[in-house]
């Protein structure tokens, strides 16, 4: 399967314009991107502190260490949960669910109560006392449980006496969309589970009839060590260039994280040779899915000081994921437009010029009006010159975010423009 993926990446690379595919020296950078994507995807699940995340971190650290960066590891404590049973049942209907972190287990007998439907405004179809609440979210590309349309109805249901809440994550794939969470403690007073829209029909019907359902969430959980790292190439200069990317996530994260990781490596390889008048700090964080837990810790301990940093580029989610046809489920050669470029105000004119024609990025936002994810943490820490890309592609936080969701050609063309942005900013 990996070999097939590699052939697909290489075939996609052939579609690059001649100028974009030219090698720097004897290297074909697009082919390097293909290999990097294949390697990243091959690590499997990237949940923070798990085997895939740890192996990925070790690989990335070794890649930039070979370029001359000195690596400093930073331990981060992250939650984990390995399910034994995770299911919702009602009569003859039974469906797998995704336990919402930080997981509150039910015990082996589960939690049983009448199914009561609630909507995004917290309105309930009946009494929630002793109920299993069924939250039917509106259609969206969901990403986090921290937003009000998710957090507030769940909290209200528990306040009204619900024993558990099951959330239908309505979105473009019909599958469970995993939701980021506070990584420090459980967000809610009881068990919360996510249900795929494709599996929700029997339970919505049962809620209309007032039937009882049982939610079972059992498994092994707690906290485990994960690790951020920073690679420094200290040239003894006055100022630093910082480039960061998260690597962790709920599933395989091919489209969500693969493009950012490959672009980060592209920039590290280029900057280690070409950027000679700045010190370099290349930062790679775990714990992203716990509301940027890793990034927050890195900013406290390892990142260069704001006053010493000329420019910080953050490569977040959906750097260059594939577009799809919703009607047919067919992947397209083009890039998903739901990616956003946010820059500090002084960088807006340059960003508009450089990213003209780059789908989704051609209309950059001022960070005064729009920021997200780790960028928000970076700005809050006092960094003055910052650019970040982030977004939500069709399979964002979905189990089948796999090799179909990213191509070397699109990642390479995007990485090249970010290289141009760095060149122009640090020359100014």
Show the residue positions of the predicted features.
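Noncatalytic luminal/extracellular "stalk/propeptide" segments of secretory-pathway proteins
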Residues: 26-30, 35-132, 139-141
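Soluble metallo-hydrolase cores and metallopeptidase-like ectodomains found primarily
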Residues: 93, 97-125, 181-255, 266-273, ...
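His/Asp/Glu-rich mid-to-C-terminal helical/loop segments that flank catalytic regions of hydrolases
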Residues: 280, 394-428
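Metal-dependent peptidase/peptidase-like ectodomains
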Residues: 238, 285-387
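Second-shell loop/turn segments in exported
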Residues: 26, 42-51, 140-148, 152-153, ...
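N-terminal secretory signal peptides and thylakoid transit peptides that target proteins
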Residues: 1-17
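Extracellular/luminal Protease-associated
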Residues: 98-191
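Catalytic-core environment of secreted peptidases
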Residues: 29-51, 61-68, 124-126, 132-147, ...
